[in-house]
Amino acid sequence: MPGRTRRDGGSESGGKDRRDRRDGGRGGAAQEKTPQFERVVTINRVAKVVKGGRRFSFTALVVVGDGDGMVGVGYGKAKEVPAAIAKGVEEAKKNFFRVPRLGGTITHPVQGEDAAGVVLLRPASAGTGVIAGGPVRAVLECAGVHDVLSKSLGSDNPINIVHATVAALKQLQRPEEVAARRGLPLEDVAPAFMLRARAGQGA
């Protein structure tokens, strides 16, 4: 009887401890995670021809961002779609970069190119919204850009468009950086809407 009591007691306490550790682990991970946006741009099925036939796998292009200036793009490949998306998310997190913004728009017009993809981005006034197609919109929304005009001038391949958009965003610079590099006052290089906003705040 004492032996059985020890076994029962041990299993109950051990199971409770294991449940507590699992719950605590999940809770801790949830608290550490920062809010993020994930957009799956495209999923493709890939066939590899081998001696015994064809083997299929899936690729996923994923955009991840915090909606506050940080964004990254990842490409995942696996035998199942969820696994491919998960790999894409992990790679996107490793490729995070910061996008300079003024309010909810970009700092200046810019054009990005990657392979045959060409994307043009222009600042827009507040309330305009994201005027962009699917792949470009996914990147801009995840980056926290709410007002922007865009146009795709090259390939319609979603992968090329996404990478061209990223190339364009990486070219953005803040007016303060441009003024310091050129040795000019901020008023000479800052966009008009930025100066008007500052004047309104000063008044």
From Swiss-Prot:
Gene3D superfamilies documented for this protein: 3.30.160.20, 3.30.230.10
Region (Disordered): 1-36
Ranges of residues in domain S5 DRBM: 36-99
Keyword Ribonucleoprotein listed: yes
PROSITE patterns according to UniProt: RIBOSOMAL_S5 (PS00585), S5_DSRBD (PS50881)
Annotated keywords: Ribonucleoprotein, Ribosomal protein, RNA-binding, rRNA-binding
Biased composition regions of type Basic and acidic residues, renumbered to the chain: 1-25
GO biological process terms, semicolon-separated: translation
UniProt GO cellular component terms: small ribosomal subunit
Pfam families, per the entry: Ribosomal_S5 (PF00333), Ribosomal_S5_C (PF03719)
Domain of life: Bacteria
One MF annotation (Gene Ontology) recorded for this entry: rRNA binding
UniProt note: domains: The N-terminal domain interacts with the head of the 30S subunit; the C-terminal domain interacts with the body and contacts protein S4. The interaction surface between S4 and S5 is involved in control of translational fidelity.
Quaternary structure, from the entry: Part of the 30S ribosomal subunit. Contacts proteins S4 and S8.
Family of this protein: Belongs to the universal ribosomal protein uS5 family.
Free-text function comment from the UniProt entry: With S4 and S12 plays an important role in translational accuracy.
Protein name: Small ribosomal subunit protein uS5
Organism of provenance: Saccharopolyspora erythraea (strain ATCC 11635 / DSM 40517 / JCM 4748 / NBRC 13426 / NCIMB 8594 / NRRL 2338)
